[in-house]
């Protein structure tokens, strides 16, 4: 079993983890029955972990979302797809490894699955470009989504990126155009689209595969227009104020659900998805099946209209000192 990587605010659990590991080693090396002591320590560790994660700040949630052992797109796909076949290439000479896609089935329903893919270590992260897709990645995603639309396959996307790659080469290859084209085309696909933020949902890199009929988000994932570090540097010329920026940006599932940006917050195991990835996979699969069944009942025209309306209402607001007037206008704003 790989050693668990503990975040700064999890340090109170370090001593408990050491004791649990020592007892496990004792059980392996001798015939002494330590099951009762092990159960007590594991129960105590779980309780303390729940207490810590119940009161995370937005800045701490970012650390959880970026956890190196957090389940990735491929992890989730392999958990609930036995027939996954990855498809490659943007048909323009490239095959971006930071954004993957392919065919599979969920509960016997054929689907297209695609998402950002980070690495587990430095070497793999270099290959995956730390989950930051280049223009070719978004063009590959568009090609696969067009394929899904042509063959009436629902589209499932998994978002986990700090943002689209912002290097000079990406700009030269048309990063903005590639993302903008995806946004435009996704509004016109006549198949259900479900997007899930499984880790970081950063800026245009997330939006490039995020135009969906249902947008789901794990409890400790984040969704933001810019990283808190970048926001703090821009607004206050001080990256050290990232914690304040994280709070102001409203990046958590709770905030975004209240603002109407996302449709559902998926609960995570105590300690985050990295502590119990199988449980997290079952939660995600159940949510996808529920929303997919609802969307498959809709006619194509209804699907397109609801998708358009969902995004059209974002950002609408009214200005008035008259509270009753605002209440009267709210139904019109949300229509």
UniProtKB/Swiss-Prot annotation:
CoA carboxyltransferase C-terminal domain span: 40-294
Catalytic function, reaction form: N(6)-carboxybiotinyl-L-lysyl-[protein] + acetyl-CoA = N(6)-biotinyl-L-lysyl-[protein] + malonyl-CoA
GO molecular function: acetyl-CoA carboxylase activity; ATP binding; carboxyl- or carbamoyltransferase activity
Subcellular location: Cytoplasm
Membrane-spanning intervals of the chain: none
GO biological process: fatty acid biosynthetic process; malonyl-CoA biosynthetic process
Keyword terms, alphabetized: ATP-binding, Cytoplasm, Fatty acid biosynthesis, Fatty acid metabolism, Lipid biosynthesis, Lipid metabolism, Nucleotide-binding, Transferase
EC number: 2.1.3.15
Keyword Nucleotide-binding recorded: yes
Primary residence: cytoplasm
Gene Ontology cellular component annotations, sorted alphabetically: acetyl-CoA carboxylase complex
InterPro entries documented for this protein: Acetyl_CoA_COase_a_su (IPR001095), ClpP/crotonase-like_dom_sf (IPR029045), COA_CT_C (IPR011763)
Domain of life of the native organism: Bacteria
Pathway named in the protein's UniProt entry: Lipid metabolism; malonyl-CoA biosynthesis; malonyl-CoA from acetyl-CoA: step 1/1
Subunit structure of this chain's protein: Acetyl-CoA carboxylase is a heterohexamer composed of biotin carboxyl carrier protein (AccB), biotin carboxylase (AccC) and two subunits each of ACCase subunit alpha (AccA) and ACCase subunit beta (AccD).
HAMAP family per record: AcetylCoA_CT_alpha
Protein function: Component of the acetyl coenzyme A carboxylase (ACC) complex. First, biotin carboxylase catalyzes the carboxylation of biotin on its carrier protein (BCCP) and then the CO(2) group is transferred by the carboxyltransferase to acetyl-CoA to form malonyl-CoA.
Family: Belongs to the AccA family.
Name of this protein: Acetyl-coenzyme A carboxylase carboxyl transferase subunit alpha
Organism: Prochlorococcus marinus subsp. pastoris (strain CCMP1986 / NIES-2087 / MED4)
Gene: accA
